């Protein structure tokens, strides 16, 4: 099974990806996580350091694939999850899709691309140009990480359009949305009501999720010294269990930008007005007492 994780930049894709990878490993699967971001920090919380990228390694070997060995680019992280960082082209030049293609090509040279139960692509931000949509060419499922905000849902909608387009020529489905670190889920639910798709999980606003990134550890590793965090790990285990059932998934239908803006803004404004009216009525009742 091959997964591609997308979402707005800074939404917590890498943190989510690393914890899902471990959850899948905890369920007995052999997992490879491939970071597809020029920052090359997707697997940081799995390994505890920034591993060499495939592109940097190939450049050092003058692109002689026969001189590159699996141990040069594949590093084992926490819970036995194997890690690869694709790297990226020089700033302002090249294409991220080419980098992903070179990564897959090299892994196939090692016969490694097919020896894993699960391969998870953690992909740069919300860029859905042909290049950074390249991991969708290899994926069985796309997962979108979002929160309950306008910007993240706009990004999710654009990614949804990319999934629909790729599904025309590839056996790709959207597994669903993951809400990350959010107090509410009303905007997410409103969006899903209009564009039907599964919600795999909504993680609460827990500071330890963000702190884990700073510490260079996953929630699972932090739980070893802080057992009270086990309930957070259970969210990721639930996501893993859903994915391992190989869900049918959906070919989503995105909204137009203006349509989405009107949907979310009207819902938000109506909710705010309703809250204000309720507060005003409660104040009037208090005055009567």
Swiss-Prot record:
Binding site for [4Fe-4S] cluster: 95, 129
Positions bound to Mg(2+): 14
SUPFAM superfamilies the UniProt entry points to: P-loop containing nucleoside triphosphate hydrolases
InterPro entries, A to Z: NifH/chlL_CS, NifH/frxC, P-loop_NTPase, Protochlorophyllide_ATP-bd
Cofactors, names only: [4Fe-4S] cluster
Protein location: Plastid, Chloroplast
NCBIfam families in UniProt: DPOR_bchL (TIGR01281)
Reactions mediated catalytically: chlorophyllide a + oxidized 2[4Fe-4S]-[ferredoxin] + 2 ADP + 2 phosphate = protochlorophyllide a + reduced 2[4Fe-4S]-[ferredoxin] + 2 ATP + 2 H2O
Gene3D superfamilies: P-loop containing nucleotide triphosphate hydrolases
Record: residues binding ATP: 10-15, 39, 180-181
Keyword Ion transport: no
Name under which the protein is recorded: Light-independent protochlorophyllide reductase iron-sulfur ATP-binding protein
Any one of the GO CC terms: chloroplast
Name of the gene encoding the protein in the UniProt record: chlL
Manner of cofactor binding, per the entry note: Binds 1 [4Fe-4S] cluster per dimer.
């Amino acid at each position: 099974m091959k997964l591609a994780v997308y979402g707005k930049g800074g939404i917590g894709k890498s943190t989510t990806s690393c914890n899902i990878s471990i959850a899948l490993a905890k369920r007995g699967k052999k997992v490879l996580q491939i970071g597809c971001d020029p920052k090359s920090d997707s697997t940081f919380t799995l390994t505890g350091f920034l591993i060499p990228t495939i592109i940097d390694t190939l450049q050092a070997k003058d692109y002689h694939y026969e001189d590159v060995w699996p141990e040069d680019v594949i590093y084992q992280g926490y819970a036995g999850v194997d890690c690869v960082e694709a790297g990226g082209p020089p700033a302002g030049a090249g294409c991220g899709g080419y980098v992903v293609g070179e990564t897959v090509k090299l892994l196939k040279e090692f016969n490694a691309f097919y020896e894993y139960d699960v391969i998870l692509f953690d992909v740069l931000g919300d860029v859905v140009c042909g290049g950074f949509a390249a991991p969708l060419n290899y994926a069985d499922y796309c997962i979108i990480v979002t929160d309950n905000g306008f910007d993240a849902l706009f990004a999710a909608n654009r990614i949804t359009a990319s999934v629909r387009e790729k599904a025309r020529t590839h056996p790709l489905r959207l597994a669903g949305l993951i809400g990350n670190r959010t107090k509410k889920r009303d905007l997410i639910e409103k969006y899903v009501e209009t564009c039907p798709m599964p919600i795999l999980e909504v993680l609460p606003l827990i500071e330890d999720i963000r702190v884990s990134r700073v510490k260079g550890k996953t929630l699972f590793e932090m739980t070893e010294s802080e057992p009270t965090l086990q309930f957070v790990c259970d969210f990721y285990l639930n996501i893993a269990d859903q994915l391992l059932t190989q869900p049918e998934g959906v070919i989503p239908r995105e909204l137009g930008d203006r349509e989405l803006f009107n949907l979310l803004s009207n819902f938000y404004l109506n909710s705010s007005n309703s809250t204000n009216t309720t507060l005003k009525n409660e104040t009037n009742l208090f005055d009567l007492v």
